[in-house]
Design a protein with these regions (language model features):
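Glycine- and aromatic-enriched membrane insertion/assembly motifs of diderm outer-membrane
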Residues: 66-99
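Surface-exposed coil loops of outer-membrane beta-barrel proteins
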Residues: 49-70, 99-121, 127-216, 222-229, ...
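Outer-membrane beta-barrel pore domains
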Residues: 62-65, 99-102, 109-115, 149, ...
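Residues on the lipid-exposed face of transmembrane beta-strands in outer-membrane beta-barrel proteins
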Residues: 41, 69, 73, 78-82, ...
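Cleavable N-terminal export/targeting peptides
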Residues: 1-33
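Outer-envelope exported proteins of Gram-negative bacteria
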Residues: 38-42, 90-96, 135-139, 190, ...
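Outer-membrane beta-barrel channels and translocator barrels
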Residues: 32-34, 83-87, 129-132, 143, ...
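Outer-membrane beta-barrel biogenesis signature
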Residues: 18, 25-68, 142, 147, ...
């Protein structure tokens, strides 16, 4: 709920003021503590054109590049971090339409605005001296699920995959325990309040598991699992679970491949709902400044539940090509062409025209980092 006298505008201003204060404090502290506290961030903006000219001016089935035919501030982020030696912390403060989607606030959701809305992550971290060192994180943190992440600069493509948008959560609030059994084998356990939840909506905790293994320096394997009740009483009749599998392969120093596959289901009063999909990625770096990346994927949503469209036998595919160039280390520019298509006509077109089976978009994204 919104506290009387503490409107979204006032709270946003309050958070900005706090961020500036903490930033100044952190810089001062880092000078006195041999850079113990690191400060970084970026501003991410884009322009997208949908050639179907949708009357809604929205790219259907996207999550972080929804508005089209307009310049959009996707994400502005400030990160303050102190490594656990043995105690540390991390705080990510976010603003922009991508953050609105992550937090589920209007116009992309119904979650009331709060001071937590602009906190992507905020957790305490500590290393417990057991064996190789058990790391414990307590607070709000991004999910371990999926190959892609919220920040576009850390992905191979600018737009996010269907799997990232619809198959998995964005963040959790709770406890994360990580233990490195070896340099190439790590296991993490999560006990959290559920999917995209600051406060749990039922009496049960959700469990997460992340297992990563690198059989060689060029190959990486990861299995991620989420399992728990996600509906409020009296609708919490069954669990929601997702299995997420990732394989990465550096073929050469310049060429890399990735496979990401997901399966999820949830038991509701109305029955079992399922979703599944897979994405294949390839990236070739011409040099330190420029690279090209391709992504192809399929997402199957038989009951239309994961996407929220309610369309039966929904089968969606997409192909994305992205070229990137770094003018300087702190400025990343990307041009991207993407085609989404479905067995069912779900994509918007011009006013008074029926929906169509596909949409073609072109996007230019710019990220300035510090």
């Amino acid at each position: 709920m919104i506290i009387h006298g503490f409107t979204p505008v006032r709270s946003a201003g309050f958070l900005i003021s706090c961020s500036v204060f903490v930033l100044q404090f952190a810089v001062g502290q880092s000078k006195d503590s041999s850079q113990a506290i690191s400060v970084s961030g970026f501003v991410d903006a884009y322009y997208s054109k949908n050639f179907a000219d949708p009357a809604s001016h929205a790219n259907k089935l996207r999550n972080f590049d929804i508005p089209e035919n307009q310049i959009n501030l996707s994400l502005a982020e400030i990160v303050l971090q102190k490594k656990a030696q043995p105690i540390g912390f991390r705080v990510d403060v976010d603003f922009g339409t991508a953050n609105d989607v992550v937090q589920g606030i209007a116009p992309y959701g119904t979650t009331p605005y709060s001071t937590l809305t602009n906190i992507q992550q905020a957790y305490l971290t500590g290393v417990i001296p057991i064996g190789n060192g058990l790391t414990a994180d307590v607070g709000k943190f991004v999910t371990h699920m999926g190959y892609e992440v919220i920040e576009s600069k850390d992905n191979w493509n600018y737009s996010r995959s269907l799997l990232f948008a619809w198959a998995i959560p964005y963040y959790h609030t709770g406890l994360r325990l990580t233990y490195p059994f070896a340099d190439n084998f790590t296991v993490a356990l999560h006990v959290v309040n559920g999917w995209n939840s600051n406060i749990d909506n039922n009496a049960e905790k959700s469990l997460g598991l992340a297992v990563s293994y690198s059989p060689s320096g060029s190959t990486g394997l990861m299995l991620n699992v989420m399992d728990g009740f996600e509906q409020p009483p009296p609708f919490d009749v069954g669990k929601k679970k997702v299995f997420d599998f990732i394989v990465t392969q550096n073929v050469t120093d310049a060429f890399a491949l990735t496979l990401n596959a997901d399966y999820g289901d949830e038991t509701l009063i109305s029955g079992l709902k399922t979703w599944r999909g897979a994405a294949v990625y390839g990236r070739y770096a011409f040099n330190a400044k420029s690279a090209v990346a391709l992504r192809g994927e399929i997402f199957d949503d038989p009951e239309g539940y994961a996407t929220g469209l309610g369309v039966p036998q929904l089968d969606v595919k997409e192909v994305t090509a992205t070229y990137e160039y770094k003018f300087v280390d702190a400025l990343l520019v990307r041009g991207e062409a993407r085609y989404d298509f479905s067995t069912t006509p779900i994509f918007d077109k011009k006013a008074n025209v029926n929906t169509v089976n596909g949409q073609m978009t072109f996007l230019v994204g710019v990220v300035a980092m510090f």
